Amino acid sequence: MDMDSGSMGVAFQPSEPIASTILCCECGVPTPPNAAAMCMDCIKMTTDITSGIPRESTVNHCRECERYMQPPNNWMIAPLESRELMAICLKKLRGLNQVRLVDANFIWTEPHSRRIKVKLTVQKEAFTNTILQQSFQVEFYVNNTQCPDCARTYTPHIWKAVCQVRQKVLHKRTFLYLEQIILKHKAHMNTVNIKETKDGIDFYFGQRAHAIKMVEFLSAVVPIRYKGSEELISEDFKSNTANYKFTYSIEIVPICKDDLVCLPKTVAKAHGNIAQLVVCTKVGPTIRFLDPLTLQTCDMLPSIYWRTPFPALADIPELTEFIVADVDLLGPTNGKYALADVELIKSSDGSTHLTRTHLGGILNAGNTVLAYHLAVTNFNNEVYDTLREDSIPEVVIVKKTYPQTKKKNRNWRLKTIGMQKAEDVKKQDIERQERDYELFLQNLEEDPELRQGVNLYKAPVKAIAVADTDMDEEDEVDEDIPQISVDELLDDVEAMHI
């Protein structure tokens, strides 16, 4: 049969497939087929994937060292709401390995409540092709206890190794600076005790590795040499074990900043043929010497010094005060130093002297300087006696001084290490320590390079108010006097009781 030309065909459109559903066995709501035969809402209500995870736990905290116990026997520093504290808390939850941890964060609590709350989000496959995600809170109780290291500090003779640091000089300015470096880098955190002796400091450690770490730290900041020894305490032949105590004797080079030194001839030639009569300008991992007549400098390694040791020719107590009458710059410079001819007037008798100095860039007529007056000083030094008289200047200028009108109450302060003081300290020693400490504070104010290795903290508000009052009472204040700006000071968080 022929189709009419005007008729139109109808296209076949298949119907959309209808997904099969089942009725939920709990509430009767149609739901896609699954192994539980329940809808998602009923699965969430009847299935708890966190049933094996405890909602409460305990973490051990040491009051002395502020460390938390990390199972099984480790103790670590973990500030509040830190990643380290979160790791400690999660390791306390036994059933956490049965689920997949998606998120974990702290819930704020009062610091004094001794509670730590953590919100966890986990996932787990409850049935075939059915993954559930739930969030819940876990509360940890902070159990204040005492770690083994802190417990040993209250027991005598518990140290395993000791570092005995010594320097054969008549002052303790080096140890004052070393104390601030140790505080800045927290190198004393592993000590069980620190004792101050007449000519040094003893650091006691519970482990030998901590003592070795201290020796390495000291060698990186001051020129030293050390010698190790061990003492047998007990021995067990059955188990083939022995108990030793280790001692590290550390000696710092007896050369300090601003000391006048006469180098042996062989040592001077080995260091760029520098002049034998030099001034020590810096003490660090190496010793830096400067020739004040030529501005030539050299750095000496501690190993070279101990190979041919030599004493300081003169130190700070032997400095004499002079007044600058005239300064004539010669032109040569070396960093912050500038060579100049200076005419000086001795403060005690008014005699005039001509000398050459490396401090021409900061000296002006009328300034006061401290210098070694070699023309009237006798030295008991064999190397110095071999020098030619025409190579020895009358006066060697070391540093510029400032009027002593500075306020006693400074707007900054230093922290100290809580160490056990030496016994039977004489009154003279106490007065000398106070003078050394005041001189150390003045050096910090005058030397910006020295302040880089020290943490300076803001003084309490009362001290600052008293200092401002003292400054108001002064008629005139020399602007040339070095002062420490507030930008260099740190806030003392411990003093704020945060």
Swiss-Prot record:
Signal peptide: none annotated. It is found in: Cytoplasm; Nucleus, Nucleoplasm. GO terms for cellular component: cytoplasm; cytosol; nucleoplasm; nucleus. GO terms for biological process: protein transport; ribosomal large subunit export from nucleus. Its main location: cytoplasm. Keywords: Cytoplasm, Nucleus, Protein transport, Transport. GO terms for molecular function: protein-macromolecule adaptor activity; ribosomal large subunit binding. InterPro entries: Nmd3 (IPR039768), Nmd3_N (IPR007064), NMD3_OB (IPR048898), NMD_SH3 (IPR048899). It comes from the Eukaryota. Belongs to the NMD3 family. Associates with the 60S ribosomal subunit. Acts as an adapter for the XPO1/CRM1-mediated export of the 60S ribosomal subunit. This is 60S ribosomal export protein nmd3. It comes from Schizosaccharomyces pombe (strain 972 / ATCC 24843). The lineage of its organism: Eukaryota, Fungi, Dikarya, Ascomycota, Taphrinomycotina. The gene is nmd3.
